[in-house]
Amino acid sequence: MPKKSSRKLTAAGGATTSAAAKRRLGDRDKKTLGDLTNLADGVVAAAEKKKDPHLDIPTRSLSNVKYNKTKRFIEMGSNTNRRQLFNLSQAKSYMQTLLAASGSKRLIDEGKTTSLRGLFYMLLHDIEGTKEKTFGDQSESDTVIEDLEVTVNALREELHVYASNRGGMVGPITLIDSGDEIDCARMGSGGYSIPSIVEPNVIEFKKCTAKFILHVEKDTVWRRFNEDKFWVKHNCLLTHGGGQPPRGVRRLLNRLHTELKLPVYCLLDNDPWGYYIYSVIKQGSINLAFESQRMAVPDAKYLGLRSIDYERCELADGVKITLSDTDAKRARQIADYPWFKGKKPWEKEIDQMLKNGFKMEVESLISKDISYVTEQYVPARLKEKDWLD
């Protein structure tokens, strides 16, 4: 039986089983390939027993995640949504999921990767005998890939699918990136562009003398720190995620912290979005709750911007951005997260922002001086160990 299902899945993807045999698969590729094949085996087994083939997709929602107080990150619960072949409302999404599995297997077999956009076109075709296409647009295939991730317990990048690079790093670390040696202290004004796939088989850490990591929210703030050579003066790595950090950035932060024992400090906007970004870096995200152990950094610290900084730093009135009703609602939702609830410093922080009635961006510190954030604010927070946990 396994041989039969394996052939079917491979044929659908357009590759041959010998393709994988011609190259040496890493342990993770072997596991992912095995999980994809097992998915196909289950379909064939159900069909041979004359049962309705189905897939049980773990539910990706807040209601299906739990906070592990011991590990200090969120984990996925046991709730699933069943996707059945012989259910008219589910048949197409069932087909799309197996089609995505087939495409991923083909990529692994051939030792190639593709973008989310590339995968969409790779899987796009007319369904024989109908006027239907396999996918209406890329948003459908993106969602299916996320479903496939949680079903086979593998990151998208382990399915050989990547997103566009977003995020950067500079500092005293030398990497081996796909065989090329990269000195991140010699990357000019733009820094090293953090790729989507940063697993050990792609990115190796050759040498690092940094003492910690400062992660800032936006490229604009990162550029100020880089131009002022903050990373040279304080012997650290400086990273950014272009707003909400993408998977590659979060996975890299996790690896740098776990493997090199580097503390992670976050400098984010004083608004609900900044709080949420910190939550995702520290505890993990709902969509990737099944992989929090490889994505989250439970020891990450929140340096700022803080709700008390308007008065503490004597900022100008012009930096205030009025909190909207949506902002206030979101802040209360975040305060109610199990990993924030009960933490007095965080309750005080969020309450203060709500009382203030305004939010602030890190760039607001420029109203003091263009280099105030790099020369005074962050050095003082680090020296005084003044952060939220």
Show the residue positions of the predicted features.
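Nucleic-acid enzyme cleavage-core boundary/entry regions
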Residues: 1-265, 272-389
